[in-house]
Amino acid sequence: MQANTPRPRCPDCNRPTSHCLCPLISPQPSATQLLVIQHPDESRHALNTARLLTLGLDNAQLLVCEELPPEWQAWLTDPHWQTRLLFPRPDAQPLDSRSCPAPLRLVLLDGTWRKARKLLHVNPLLQQLPAVLLDNPPTSRYRLRKASEAGALSTIEAAAEALATLEPGFERERLLRPFEALINDQISAMGDDVWQRNYR
């Protein structure tokens, strides 16, 4: 019996080539530098929004790890930059130009809440960064995951809101275009009945 042949995938967005999202990705600039630290378990997830996020920005990088490599520890402590962690810690300040003065580096953690907290736990340097949070975040469009915490957003949604808050003229919808297509494609694949029964 012949084994199933894996479907070819786009090397950039990592989607099956028949469902490649790259035509919807239009990278845009930002004065804010973004670092997305992704838990390794999340990198294998089909709905990987961190990859779409970093493809959609000229000034963003994706780091897949649990413990930060030494070179990234130096990046986080560069005295020429103001570095903030976008995470709803109890001491987090509302994100705005006062809590995030330029030149700014913004760090986001990508994973489930449990995995994100593990990233914080094993990296004391992340714990030491001043934390900021989104003030009155919108309802998530991530209709395929049930968040365990109120106001939770996917990584790409959180970044879009943060940059729209910090930088006048930033095109939030331009960044979210492939994300919307990804969600709609997954709902179409599972069928509306299944989606209604499990996610509505």
Regions found by a protein language model. Give the residues of each.
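Short, flexible, mixed-charge glycine/proline-rich loop motifs
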Residues: 1-4
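Residues immediately within or flanking Cys/His clusters that coordinate Zn2+
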Residues: 7, 17
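Short cysteine-rich clusters marking metal-coordination/redox-active sites
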Residues: 10-13
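Short Cys/His-rich "knuckle" micro-motifs
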Residues: 18-24
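Short microdomains enriched in Cys/His and/or Lys/Arg
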Residues: 24-50
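S-adenosyl-L-methionine/SAH cofactor-binding core of RNA-modifying enzymes
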Residues: 55-121, 125
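C-terminal folded domains that constitute the principal catalytic or ligand-binding module
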Residues: 114, 122-200
